[in-house]
Regions:
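Short beta-strands and strand-coil junctions in structured, solvent-facing domains, enriched
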Residues: 27-29, 88, 117-118, 156
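Active-site-proximal beta-strand/loop segments in catalytic clefts of secreted hydrolases
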Residues: 21-24, 82-85, 111-114, 159-160
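VWA/integrin I-like adhesion module and closely mimicked acidic/polar interface patches used
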Residues: 53-56, 78, 85-151
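Short, hinge-like loop/turn segments at secondary-structure boundaries
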Residues: 36-39, 126-129, 174-177
Length: 210
């Protein structure tokens, strides 16, 4: 899953700051950028399904992430948008959000995940143990994802498999992994980049949607 790939990236980038914005028809900050990787992974893995409505508001999700990165003094800041849906909700156009990111020197990487079409899927709510079944519908707009990535000086990746996704995230973290070290006579302080993941994985069925 996307969570497994992100787990690996976080666990192997000690000292970097990571955050997560969840997105559907609305968006919400699950974890603001933090160097506390234990807290980050716990909150990311506990993201509930279906709490943010039906749809994919890419522009709104990006704007939420930008708001939390803009004031940072980190030397490099980036957003990784992971989505299997096209923009179909929200009042902010994705291109407008991408232009805002570029104006704040925030790099945007976009990942279109899955192969287009539908596939059966089952989900067990960890809180209630209730089992849901439905279809995972992938309909990402690669043209738009390429465009907004280019506007914000980033890159688009298409990830049809978990391996593709993992490799894309490795490339991104390698590109963004510069570390600046400042020295004084008695201390050495390492200042790392900040990165926010936006999760916009959309599951649709007659029972629930995200």
């Amino acid at each position: 899953t996307a969570k497994n790939a992100i787990n690996y990236i976080v666990e192997n980038n000690t000292g970097a700051s990571f955050g997560v914005v969840a997105m559907a028809a609305e968006s919400a900050v699950v974890v603001p950028p933090t160097m506390d990787h234990t807290l980050f992974l716990q909150r990311m893995n506990d993201i509930p399904i279906g709490n943010l409505g039906d749809g994919t508001a890419i522009g709104v999700g990006l704007s939420t992430a930008i708001y939390h990165l803009a004031a940072s003094s980190a030397p490099k800041k980036c957003i990784v948008l992971i989505t299997d849906g096209e923009n179909n909700a929200g009042a902010i156009h994705p291109e407008t959000a991408a232009e805002l990111a570029a104006s704040q020197n925030i790099t945007l990487y976009t990942l279109g995940v899955g192969s287009k079409g539908s596939a059966p899927i089952e989900y067990i709510d960890p809180k209630t143990n209730k089992k849901y079944s439905g279809y995972l519908t992938s309909s990402f707009d690669s043209t738009q994802l390429k465009l907004i990535a280019s506007i914000a000086n980033g890159r688009y990746f298409e990830a049809q498999t978990l391996n593709d996704l993992s490799l894309a995230l490795l490339v991104i973290t390698k590109n963004e992994s510069t570390v600046q070290t400042y020295h004084s006579r008695t201390t050495s302080v390492e200042y790392y980049d900040k990165l926010i993941f936006i999760s916009a994985i959309r599951l649709s069925s007659s029972c629930w949607r995200i």
